[in-house]
Amino acid sequence: MRGVSCLQVLLLLVLGAAGTQGRKSAACGQPRMSSRIVGGRDGRDGEWPWQASIQHRGAHVCGGSLIAPQWVLTAAHCFPRRALPAEYRVRLGALRLGSTSPRTLSVPVRRVLLPPDYSEDGARGDLALLQLRRPVPLSARVQPVCLPVPGARPPPGTPCRVTGWGSLRPGVPLPEWRPLQGVRVPLLDSRTCDGLYHVGADVPQAERIVLPGSLCAGYPQGHKDACQGDSGGPLTCLQSGSWVLVGVVSWGKGCALPNRPGVYTSVATYSPWIQARVSF
C-alpha cells in the first residue's frame, strides 16, 4: 500500500502501564469504532480517524496522520524540493478516496516543516510536519492519534497496524471504490531488520542500511507490507488502550518481499522536534 522512492484540544502527558507514556488527550488514539483488521482487510468508517490523504492538485500522493487539530505528520520525501505548500491539501474523515461526502474535510496546507537532519535520499529524518490553514473540528471520523514519549519504543514483536490507500501490490493500485486498507505487522529489532536487508545486497555487513532514527515492521518471509501510495502514513500500536503513532511509512524494497520488511521513521526519535513546533 509506499510512495515513490508515504478547534483546540489540550493534550496531556499520561503514564502508560508499561512505561510507554505518550502525549494524549481524552480523544487521541481512541476511535469510536474498534479495529478488526488482522491482515490486508478493508477498514470501516471511523476506524482510523487520524488517517489523512495528502493530495497534490487533487490527486492522492501520500498518507498522513492528524496529531493535533491544525497539524498532520507525514513523510518528507512526499514533497519535492521546489514543492509549494499552496499546491497541497489534506483530506480527513474519508474512507474511500473515490467518493465525496459532506462529512469529509479538505483543508489547504499553510506550511511544511522538515527536521534539520533530513537527507533527500530519505535515509534520515524522513518526516514532514504540515500546518493546516485552519484547525479542523474533531468528530467521530476526525480525531488525532497519540504521540509517543521521546525515545520510547515498543519491544520487537509488538503487533501494530499500517493503514493507507496505496497499491494492493506493485503495479496494482487500490480501486477508488475500495475503502482504506490496513494490515497487521509486528515490530522488528533494528539489527535484525538491517541484517535482512543485507541478504542478497552488495553492501558490507559493517555498513548500515537501516539507519538510526528508523524502525522496521513486517515479516521476514514478506506477504504483508505497505506499498506505493502509503508513504507518510501511520504505523500505530495499541498501548494502554490508545493507539500511538510509532512510525511513519518511509521506504522499502518493493512491497512485501522476503527479507525486505517495511522501514518507518521512528516518531519517538523526533518527538522533541515535533512537540517544540506543534501547538496542541
Swiss-Prot record:
A Pfam family: Trypsin
Signal peptide: 1-22
Single biological process term from Gene Ontology: proteolysis
Tagged with keyword Thylakoid: no
EC class name: hydrolase
Keyword ATP-binding set for record: no
Places the protein is found: Secreted
Disulphides: C62-C78, C160-C237, C193-C216, C227-C255
Keywords: Disulfide bond, Hydrolase, Protease, Secreted, Serine protease, Signal
Factors inducing expression: Up-regulated by phorbol myristate acetate (PMA).
Coiled-coil annotated spans: none
GO cellular component, one term: cytoplasm
General function of this protein: Serine protease that has amidolytic activity, cleaving its substrates before Arg residues.
Protein family per UniProt: Belongs to the peptidase S1 family.
Name under which the protein is recorded: Serine protease 33
Organism (species): Homo sapiens
Organism phylogeny: Eukaryota, Metazoa, Chordata, Craniata, Vertebrata
